[in-house]
């Protein structure tokens, strides 16, 4: 266990992919003599200790470098319950030290040309570049601002390479016309409804098309998950392409768990060329949740905040991460996930604020079953002055059974289900009408949250129960203004009251 980082090293240290000069190897050995015992250093090649309250973020099993995942808890890491959530510890210490705003800087992904190497030489080189005497005089100055500026002048160029240049500022979209129908409706002030259609486990698209056609008239956009629970299904990209062919508005989900920086940039360029204009960036469930044999889980190439940063710059600056110009840049509406119940509300609000600064234009939250606790999280966002910079779609899900309720309560990270709801589902299960009670609970939650500050719509996660979506939207009074259905396609599924109203 390191002396300063409150958690043991997740994996062994990295080694370079090339042979270093003896001088670099010597400095590397010196670094490991003190950084290993003190912080559990893995030699990532881009030390962030000053920005992360002197706790190494590489202790995180997912290798996240910009904040916690949506399953963060005060008690433990959900990937490995024998360890603390290292990002909860970072936030906790940063708030105690008054260094929390340092966490807002969008930090770069690893440069694998630098991974395994030392940083002392880079720092010494930066000191020489800035002027050794100037740096020394600045560091011993009685002016605190000058000391801080001098210190940052040495460390920032090393921390923020030229190809990244992350900061802690908000970057408004560099366009005015909506990139998608979802963005257009949100900008127009409509209360928007989106949903999910479960990707198939086979190559057959018959049921996929049927479900898309079923929900299409009732919602503005349809999401397709990207390997939910780290379990393979048809890709979100393929499902989104089918949705476009069916005349539906897709939301392409991309999980960083399975996505390299090369794949991310290639995928959004291809998706945009195929008229997919909504992209939701997610960390993704850990491979620890996947069926055996499990895939690699010690590191992700990009975290979700880094994905947002890359996609925003591709769209607004017309450049790839490597600096190449994009002659015809993509146009898309960028979204991210939000977790109102993970960790502590003030920690989560900071995480969400950082996502907005990085490029998130809309949030789809994790499932909400407690509107009162949701209010606490929303109030924290108000304090951070971000509600006018992002649209928030609250995640709701109809509980189909008592078994599903208990599974979500006990096994799904970031989801909180009050005991009162569990008791209602237990009573309904005993009476044989659990699914109906689940629908009524969902309708009650929608009614309680729809008028809260900052709430711009709902996202219905049907979890394979797509046929319930028309009823929920109809009974909640959320039919879109241009609502119309194909009678031949929907006659067996649409609530009778809805058909009469047409």
Residue ranges and their predicted role:
Residues 1-46, 62, 66, 71-174, ...:
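Iron-sulfur (Fe-S) cluster-binding modules
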Residues 69, 196, 222, 271, ...:
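Conserved, mostly hydrophobic/aromatic
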Residues 153-221:
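Conserved N-terminal beta1-alpha1 strand-loop-helix module at the mouth
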Residues 171-172, 298-327, 337-342, 384-447, ...:
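Active-site pocket-lining/capping segments in soluble small-molecule metabolic enzymes
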Residues 171-173, 192-206, 229, 250-262, ...:
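Active-site mouth loops of central-metabolism enzymes
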Residues 202-214, 235-236, 262-268, 343-354, ...:
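Short, acidic/polar
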Residues 204-206, 230-241, 260-266, 286-308, ...:
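Active-site-adjacent beta->alpha loops and helix N-cap segments on the catalytic face
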Residues 259-272, 346-356, 379, 401-406, ...:
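Catalytic cores of alpha/beta
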């Amino acid at each position: 266990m390191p002396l300063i980082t409150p958690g043991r090293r997740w994996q062994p240290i990295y080694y370079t992919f090339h042979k270093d000069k003896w001088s670099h190897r010597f400095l590397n050995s010196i670094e490991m003599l003190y950084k290993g015992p003190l912080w559990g250093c893995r030699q990532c090649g881009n030390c962030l200790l000053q920005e992360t309250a002197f706790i190494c973020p590489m202790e995180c099993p997912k290798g996240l470098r910009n904040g916690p995942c949506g399953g963060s808890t005060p008690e433990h890491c959900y990937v490995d319950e024998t360890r603390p959530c290292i990002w909860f510890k970072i936030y906790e210490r940063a708030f105690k030290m008054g260094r929390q705003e340092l966490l807002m800087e969008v930090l770069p992904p690893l440069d694998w040309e630098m991974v395994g190497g030392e940083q002392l030489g880079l720092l010494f080189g930066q000191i020489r570049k800035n002027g050794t005497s100037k740096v020394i005089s600045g560091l011993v100055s009685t002016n605190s601002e000058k000391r801080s500026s001098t210190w940052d002048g040495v460390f920032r160029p090393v921390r923020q390479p030229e190809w990244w240049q992350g900061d802690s500022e908000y970057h408004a979209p560099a366009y005015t016309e909506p990139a998608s129908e979802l963005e257009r409706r949100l900008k127009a002030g409509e209360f928007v409804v989106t949903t999910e259609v479960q990707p198939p486990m086979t190559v057959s698209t018959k049921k996929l098309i049927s479900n898309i056609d079923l929900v299409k008239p009732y919602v503005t956009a349809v999401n397709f998950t990207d390997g939910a629970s780290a379990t393979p299904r048809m890709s979100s990209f393929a499902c989104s392409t089918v949705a476009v062919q069916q005349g539906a508005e897709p939301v392409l989900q991309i999980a960083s768990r399975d996505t390299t920086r090369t794949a991310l940039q290639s995928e959004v360029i291809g998706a945009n060329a195929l008229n997919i204009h909504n992209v939701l960036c997610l960390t993704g469930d850990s491979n620890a949740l996947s069926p055996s044999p499990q895939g690699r889980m010690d590191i992700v190439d990009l975290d979700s905040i880094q994905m947002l940063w890359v996609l925003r710059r591709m769209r607004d600056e017309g450049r790839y991460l490597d600096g190449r110009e994009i002659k015809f840049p993509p146009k898309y509406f960028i979204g991210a996930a939000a977790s109102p119940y993970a960790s502590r509300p003030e920690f989560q609000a900071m995480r969400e604020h950082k996502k907005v600064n990085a490029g998130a234009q809309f949030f789809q939250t994790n499932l909400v079953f407690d509107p009162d606790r949701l209010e606490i999280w929303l109030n924290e966002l108000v304090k951070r002055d971000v509600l006018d910079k992002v649209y928030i779609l609250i995640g709701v899900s109809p509980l189909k059974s008592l078994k599903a309720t208990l599974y979500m309560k006990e096994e799904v990270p970031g989801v909180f289900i009050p005991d009162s709801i569990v008791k209602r589902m237990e009573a309904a299960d005993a009476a044989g009408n659990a699914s109906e009670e689940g629908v009524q609970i969902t309708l009650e939650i929608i009614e309680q949250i729809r008028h809260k500050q900052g709430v711009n719509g709902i996202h219905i996660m049907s979890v394979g129960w797509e046929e319930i979506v028309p009823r929920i939207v109809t009974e909640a009074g959320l039919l879109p203004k241009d609502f119309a259905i194909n009678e031949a396609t929907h006659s067996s599924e649409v609530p009778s009251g809805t058909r009469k109203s047409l």
